[in-house]
């Protein structure tokens, strides 16, 4: 779980990093791109675990939600760093 948080936060930092006076993406654009990607991941996990036992379904969805929580941590870290 910690590895997922580090990867997502690092990816958000790469998208939000400043080169001179320009950014690769604004914080909002980077957040929207990543949110769309993780919405697809969560939907794929939902479909993949449909029809399996309830305990396996809950475990798979919990893992997907942990990645989304990592995404939120990444967005917040980029937002804080962009304000400094």
Curated annotation (Swiss-Prot):
Question: GO CC annotations?
Answer: plasma membrane
* TM segment ranges: 4-20, 27-49, 59-81
Q: Name where it mostly resides.
A: membrane
Q: Which UniProt keywords apply?
A: Cell membrane, Membrane, Transmembrane, Transmembrane helix
Q: How does it sit in the membrane?
A: Multi-pass membrane protein
Q: Subcellular localization, per the record?
A: Cell membrane
> What is the name listed in the Swiss-Prot or TrEMBL entry for this protein?
Uncharacterized protein AF_0149
**Species of the source:** Archaeoglobus fulgidus (strain ATCC 49558 / DSM 4304 / JCM 9628 / NBRC 100126 / VC-16)
């Amino acid at each position: 779980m910690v590895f997922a948080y580090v990867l997502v936060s690092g990816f958000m930092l790469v998208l939000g990093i400043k080169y001179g006076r320009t950014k690769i993406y604004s914080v909002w654009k980077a957040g929207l791109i990543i949110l769309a990607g993780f919405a697809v991941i969560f939907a794929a996990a939902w479909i993949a675990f449909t029809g399996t036992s309830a305990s396996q379904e809950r475990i798979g969805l919990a893992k997907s939600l942990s990645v989304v929580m990592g995404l939120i941590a990444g967005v917040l870290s980029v937002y804080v760093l962009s304000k400094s």
